Amino acid sequence: MYGSCLLEKEAGMYPGTLMSPGGDGTAGTGGTGGGGSPMPASNFAAAPAFSHYMGYPHMPSMDPHWPSLGVWGSPYSPPREDWSVYPGPSSTMGTVPVNDVTSSPAAFCSTDYSNLGPVGGGTSGSSLPGQAGGSLVPTDAGAAKASSPSRSRHSPYAWMRKTVQVTGKTRTKEKYRVVYTDHQRLELEKEFHCNRYITIQRKSELAVNLGLSERQVKIWFQNRRAKERKMIKKKISQFENSGGSVQSDSDSISPGELPNTFFTTPSAVRGFQPIEIQQVIVSE
C-alpha cells in the first residue's frame, strides 16, 4: 500500500516519467508515458536503481531550473546529429529565433544559401536569391559613368561654329558697341565742334536725321569729350617733358599759343573794348 501511494503521488508530479508497460523499471522515453513527449537521452544522466522500493520508477536527474514536462511539449531543440545536413552558421542568421529553427528546419535548405552573394558591412542579406547586401549597387551609376564620356565629346554650340556677319553692331562682352558710318561721324563732329554739350532738342534732331537713337547720340558725345580730355592731358605732359614747343599730329603749337588753344574766349566778350577810367581829384 505504501508503494502504491508513492506511485500515485509521483505520477501526479511527473506525468511524463511513468513506468513502461513491461515494468522493467526504466523511464518511458518512447512516448509510452502519460502523454509526455520523449526527452533526449543526451540531456539527462541515468539515476541509480533503488531496491528498497519495489516498482518505483527511476527518475532522471533533471535540472531544477527547467519546468517539468507535461502536455506542453519538449522545449529542447532537436539533437545535433540532425543539424549535420544543414550548412554552417552564417552572419545573416544571427537574429533568427530558436523556436523558428526548431519548428521549421526545412526552411533552411542549401539552395537558399547558394544564391546569396557576399555580405558587406555586417548587414543582414536579403532572403531572396541574388539580393545580398554586398550587391546593392545603384543601377543608374553605370549608366551615368557610361554617359559621362559622351558628354565630354559634345560638339560646340551652333553659335560658336557659325561666322557672325557684321550688321552695323559688334558685341563686346555683354554690351553692344555701335559702329558709326562716315556720314554719321562727320555730322556728329560738326555738332561737337559747335557745342560740346548737346541740348535735348538738338539731340533728338540729330537722332532723327542720322537714323540713331537719342541714347546713341548722347553716348557718342560723352565718349568724344573723354577723348578730348585725354588728348589735352597728353599734350600737356609732352610739353612738360620737352620744355619747348609741343608737337601735335596736325601742326606745331608754340608755348605762347597754349592758353588760346586750350581756353577759347566767347565771341561776345571779344566785342567789348576796354574802358579807360579817369580819376578826378576835387580840391577845396
Swiss-Prot record:
This protein's encoding gene: CDX4
Region feature Disordered, mapped onto this chain: 15-40, 120-155, 238-259
Biased composition (Gly residues): 22-37
DNA-binding region: 173-232
Natural source organism: Homo sapiens (Human)
Keyword vocabulary terms for this entry: Developmental protein, DNA-binding, Homeobox, Nucleus, Transcription, Transcription regulation
SMART domains assigned: HOX (SM00389)
InterPro entries in the cross-refs: Caudal_activation_dom (IPR006820), Caudal_homeobox (IPR047152), HD (IPR001356), HD_metazoa (IPR020479), Homeobox_CS (IPR017970), Homeodomain-like_sf (IPR009057), HTH_motif (IPR000047)
Protein family: Belongs to the Caudal homeobox family.
Protein name: Homeobox protein CDX-4
Matches recorded under Pfam families: Caudal_act, Homeodomain
GO molecular function annotation: DNA-binding transcription activator activity, RNA polymerase II-specific; DNA-binding transcription factor activity; DNA-binding transcription factor activity, RNA polymerase II-specific; RNA polymerase II cis-regulatory region sequence-specific DNA binding; RNA polymerase II transcription regulatory region sequence-specific DNA binding; sequence-specific double-stranded DNA binding
Compartments, as annotated in UniProt: Nucleus
Domain of life: Eukaryota
PANTHER family per record: HOMEOBOX PROTEIN CDX, HOMEOBOX PROTEIN CDX-4
GO cellular component, one term: nucleus
Compositional bias of kind Polar residues: 238-253
Biological processes, Gene Ontology terms: anterior/posterior axis specification; blood vessel development; cell differentiation; digestive tract development; embryonic pattern specification; labyrinthine layer development; negative regulation of transcription by RNA polymerase II; positive regulation of transcription by RNA polymerase II
Principal cellular location given in the protein's record: nucleus
Parts of the chain that traverse the membrane: none
